Amino acid sequence: MFQKECLMEIEVYDTYAQSENGSKIHFDVMLPIGGDEPTAKKKAKEFVEKISENTSPIRLESIQFCHTETAKLEVEEKVAKDGYCIVPIENCPDPY
C-alpha cells in the first residue's frame, strides 16, 4: 500500500496566550499559502475562546507569521477540510 505524499505548502503563525494563573500557552495556527495575519488571528482567538470555556480565562498575547513548510498529512487533511489547523506546542490542550 502506498502512503500519500504531502504536497501542500502552509504558512505557520507562531501564537502565544496566557492563562489567568500566568501559564504561557504556545500553539501554531497553520493556513494555506495566501492566508493572512488577520485570518490567523481570528482562528487563534476562536481557539482561545474554545479552550477558555473549560478552564480559567485565557488571553491571546501575540501572533506572528513565522515560516512556510510542507504540511504533515494530518495538518494537510485538516487545512483542506477546515481551511486552517491548530497545532498545540506548549501547555496547550488538544484543539480537537
PLM region spans:
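Acidic, low-complexity intrinsically disordered segments
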Residues: 43-96
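Generic structural motif
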Residues: 18-20, 32-36, 89-91
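Phosphate-binding glycine-rich loops and adjacent basic patches that engage nucleotide phosphates
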Residues: 2-11, 33-43, 96
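Short, flexible N-terminal segments of the mature chain
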Residues: 25-51
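Generic structural hydrophobic/aromatic packing signal, biased to beta-strands
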Residues: 13-15, 29, 44, 86
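Short, charged/polar N-terminal "headpieces" of proteins
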Residues: 1-25
